[in-house]
């Protein structure tokens, strides 16, 4: 199963009794605020969930997987997510109950 923005919006509609339009706008607003903060170079800390941070990656040698040719991967800035301890604990607890 994959969680989508539409599914989150539908959940808000059902559980919080928001209108469908309001729940969709709420979800869009939330993700837009996360995007704006990251674009400004700010970390996004969601208590009990985790942190989105920007990380600078240095230039490094690499290999083109299609041709095998050695290439130089340029330095860049990437978004990383670090799960918070509460999220890690809940997922671990759930996984211990579920047998694969």
Curated annotation (Swiss-Prot):
PROSITE patterns linked to this entry: HISTONE_LIKE (PS00045)
Cited function: This protein is one of the two subunits of integration host factor, a specific DNA-binding protein that functions in genetic recombination as well as in transcriptional and translational control.
Keyword DNA-binding included in the entry's annotation: yes
GO molecular function annotation: DNA binding; structural constituent of chromatin
GO aspect biological process, one term: positive regulation of metabolic process
SMART domains per UniProt: BHL
Domain of life: Bacteria
Native source organism of the sequence: Buchnera aphidicola subsp. Schizaphis graminum (strain Sg)
Keyword hit for Plastid: no
Matching Gene3D superfamilies: IHF-like DNA-binding proteins
InterPro entries tied to this protein: Hist_DNA-bd, Histone-like_DNA-bd_CS, IHF-like_DNA-bd_dom_sf, IHF_alpha
Protein keywords: DNA recombination, DNA-binding, Transcription, Transcription regulation, Translation regulation
Protein name: Integration host factor subunit alpha
């Amino acid at each position: 199963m994959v969680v989508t923005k539409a599914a989150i919006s539908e959940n808000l509609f059902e559980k919080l009794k928001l209108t469908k339009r309001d729940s969709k706008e709420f979800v869009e607003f939330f993700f837009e605020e996360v995007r704006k903060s990251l674009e400004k170079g700010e970390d996004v800390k969601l208590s009990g969930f985790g942190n989105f941070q920007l990380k600078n990656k240095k230039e490094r040698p690499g290999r083109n997987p299609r041709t095998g040719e050695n290439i130089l991967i340029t330095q860049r800035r990437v978004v990383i997510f670090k799960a918070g301890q509460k999220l890690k604990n809940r997922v671990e607890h759930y996984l211990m109950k579920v047998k694969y």
